[in-house]
Design a protein with these regions (language model features):
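Conserved helix-turn-beta segment of the N-terminal RecA-like "Helicase ATP-binding" lobe
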Residues: 158-195, 329-330
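Conserved motor-coupling elements within RecA-like helicase/translocase cores
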Residues: 183-204, 212-220, 344-362
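Conserved SF1/SF2 helicase motif Ia
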Residues: 120, 134-163, 171-175
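Post-DEXD/H (motif II) to motif III coupling segment of the RecA-like Helicase ATP-binding lobe
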Residues: 217-222, 228-306
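Loop/turn-to-beta-strand initiation segments
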Residues: 147-149, 176, 199-203, 219-222, ...
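C-terminal helicase module of SF1/SF2 nucleic-acid helicases/translocases
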Residues: 75, 292-310, 314, 318-571, ...
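Upstream accessory/linker segments immediately N-terminal to the RecA-like ATPase cores of bacterial MutS
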Residues: 1-103, 494
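N-terminal pre-P-loop "Q-motif" helix
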Residues: 95-119, 133
Length: 651
């Protein structure tokens, strides 16, 4: 019994792909949920041309990245001193236990700072995973070396938030901190400018106001940029000038996919925080029709435990009316505030401060809370018209709650009686199901990762990424980077295996079609016995002891993997004979094959057929001999012989 995936092309063309080769098939993901995808005709030239254009763009991108990296390596930088006693004391004052990811990221950043070339590191981590603490430790290292540090943020609200966090974190240490934003009066701004120029100010936190011509530093040593992609083109150009010879740390809550990280390894330094802080609980998420009774109960339940609430109404024109309705519903004794991006500076600053101080119990707001707001006491979130927001945005907004050990609740609502589009329904299902940290959560992160890849590579490359799909583009970029470095991209010899053996995932073992497809793909992508054992352990943990067809399926995957290493592109059984076809005459490991054919046990049943362009090794099976086990043994012996011959040639 074998399973196949049926792929339909325009017209009546159909392709059946064996489940054992599902590693060759990936779902098209281009980052645009609603954008229709134009299908290529089977055997046509459209796809070849599109892929060629994307490959050329990836090559240009690789050249540009390598040139930028080489230029930065030539610039003189400041080598910061190793950690001092004060640095250790500052880090010991952290009120939480660091995760391994945080500690590793901190060590990588310090190593960069102590080097004599300017640091250019990207720190990626989900909302609430502790990037700010990592950045503040880098700031402390900079200040203790007698230099100034700047933290650049996209919004005024976030500048105030970081300022408050820094004041608390550096309390008791001789660090002079200032904030530069539109909340400042003329006199206050002049004082900050003067302190920066004279060196009195050690750390300044601000919006793009920091990029203005009148901002002069006495001795800037570290620039921390939070959510760089939110800045405009002009600001980014000014940022490049400012960061040329100072250590730069960029923070991103949009995850950069591991595959892209690997493709750019050695070109763009990246640190990732993938694990949530200790004691952090996933947010309990509900998707439901908007119902004032349910909402009132949810708010009262949060207020009863001393917490606060975000109520997101994303229309500025009607936000005051919404707040009035909540007052009527909850009673005048409940303190309700309003926050949106069109408010004047003082008004918005005052509201956010009142919320932080606990004076406002329910904040009716727009998506202004999406970036950086960190108030651990707000642990219930209600979103109106959640079906209008993208998965990435919903995830970011939900990340504003659940920032303490207390359980948090999110209510994603849509209008009563509204029939959701298929896309919106899928999005809301994903945000509900993937609240957990872990494997399911990573599936929901797919949309975020595509956005992260687009942010890192720029809008032009995002277009090419959409034309061929996310996975294919990353493969092309990785190959282009290796080529630009003068390294050879690994040649992929694909191998099909068609043996008379029952190898499949029975429905009785994994009932969900979607999960079966995912496991099929993961099994087909196995390359080593260690990977196979890890996946087997996971299967046992999730579904119980696997039946024989599942184990045979994993053996077929390992057979394909070993066969690829020795240049075999097809394994096929016809009755009592198995043929191993090589990908051309050059692919045949002649010495290894001849050594195997000359063994007494193989003399009558193993022959090399060199006719045609694709040489074949033919193996005759004895009665009752297991085809899969025999094929595994033969391919394993060939690989060992080939490796030994290569060692002898090297010596």
């Amino acid at each position: 019994v074998k399973d196949y995936v049926k792929i339909a092309y325009p017209g009546t063309d159909t392709l059946y792909v064996p489940a054992t080769q599902l590693d060759l098939v990936s779902k098209y993901t281009g980052g645009g949920e609603e954008k229709p995808v134009k299908l290529s005709k089977m055997g046509g030239s459209d796809w070849v041309k599109t892929r060629s254009r994307a490959k050329s763009a990836a090559k240009d991108m690789a050249k540009k990245l390598i040139a930028l990296y080489a230029e930065r390596q030539r610039l003189p930088g400041h080598a910061f001193a190793p950690d001092s006693e004060w640095q250790r004391e500052f880090e010991d004052n952290f009120g939480y236990t660091e995760t391994d990811d945080q500690l590793r990221s901190i060590a990588e950043i310090k190593r960069d700072m102590e080097a004599s070339v300017p640091m250019d590191r990207l720190l990626c981590g989900d909302v609430g995973f502790g990037k700010t603490e990592v950045a503040l430790r880098a700031v402390m290292k900079c200040v203790l070396s007698g230099k100034q540090a700047a933290i650049l943020v996209p919004t005024t609200v976030l500048a105030q938030q970081h300022y408050q966090t820094a004041l608390q974190r550096f309390f008791g240490f001789p660090v002079n901190i200032a904030v530069m934003s539109r909340f400042k009066t003329g006199n206050q701004a002049s004082k900050v400018l003067s302190d920066l120029a004279t060196g009195k100010c050690d750390l300044v936190i601000g919006t793009h106001r920091l990029l203005s011509k009148d901002v002069k530093f006495k001795d800037l040593g570290l620039l921390v940029v939070d959510e760089e992609q939110r800045f405009g083109v002009t600001h980014k150009e000014k940022l490049k000038e400012l960061s040329r010879q100072v250590d730069t740390l960029t923070l991103s809550a949009t995850p950069i996919p591991r595959t892209l990280n690997m493709a750019l390894s050695g070109i763009r330094d990246m640190s990732t925080i993938e694990v949530p802080p200790v004691d952090r609980q996933p947010v309990q998420t509900y998707v439901l029709e908007h119902n004032w009774g349910v909402i009132a109960d949810a708010i009262r339940r949060e207020l009863a435990r001393g917490g606060q609430v975000y109520y997101m109404h994303n229309r500025v024109e009607t936000i005051d009316r919404c707040a009035a309705q909540l007052r009527k519903l909850l009673g005048e004794e409940i303190s309700i505030g309003v926050a949106h991006g069109k408010m004047d500076e003082k008004g918005l600053s005052s509201v956010m401060q009142q919320l932080s101080d606990g004076e406002i119990q329910v904040l009716v707001c727009t998506t202004i809370i999406e970036t950086g707001i960190d108030i651990p006491n707000v642990n219930t979130l209600i979103i109106e018209d959640a079906d209008r927001l993208g998965l990435a945005q919903l995830h970011q907004i939900r990340g504003r709650i659940g920032r303490s050990a207390r359980r948090a609740y999110a209510y994603m609502t849509y209008r009563a009686g509204k029939i959701l589009t298929e896309v919106a329904a899928k999005r809301l299902t994903a945000i509900r199901e993937y609240a957990e940290f872990g494997s399911g959560f990573r599936i929901a992160m797919r949309d975020l990762e595509i956005r992260g890849a687009g942010n890192l590579l720029g809008p032009e490359q995002s277009g090419y990424m959409m034309s061929v799909g996310y996975d294919m583009y990353l493969q092309l970029l990785e190959e282009a980077v290796l080529e630009q470095r003068g390294e050879k991209a690994p040649q992929r010899t694909e191998c099909s295996a068609d043996l008379t053996v029952s190898a499949n995932l029975p429905e009785s073992y994994i009932s969900s079609g979607e999960q079966r497809m995912d496991i099929y793909r993961r099994i087909a992508a196995l390359r080593t016995a260690e990977q196979s054992q890890e996946l087997l352990d996971e299967l046992i943990d999730r579904y119980g002891e696997p039946p024989p067809p599942v184990l045979r399926l994993m053996d077929v995957a390992l057979l394909r993997a070993e066969a690829m290493q020795i240049g075999v592109c097809d394994i096929a059984q016809r009755g009592s004979e198995i043929s191993f076809t090589f990908a051309g005459a050059d692919a045949v490991p002649v010495n290894a094959v001849m050594a195997l054919c000359s063994l007494p046990k193989n003399r009558r049943r193993l022959t090399l057929s060199a006719t045609g362009t694709e040489p074949k090794l033919l193996l005759r099976l004895t009665p009752n001999e297991d085809a899969l086990d025999t094929a595994l043994t033969l391919v394993g012996d060939l690989r060992v012989n080939k490796e030994e011959n290569e060692k002898e040639v090297t010596l």
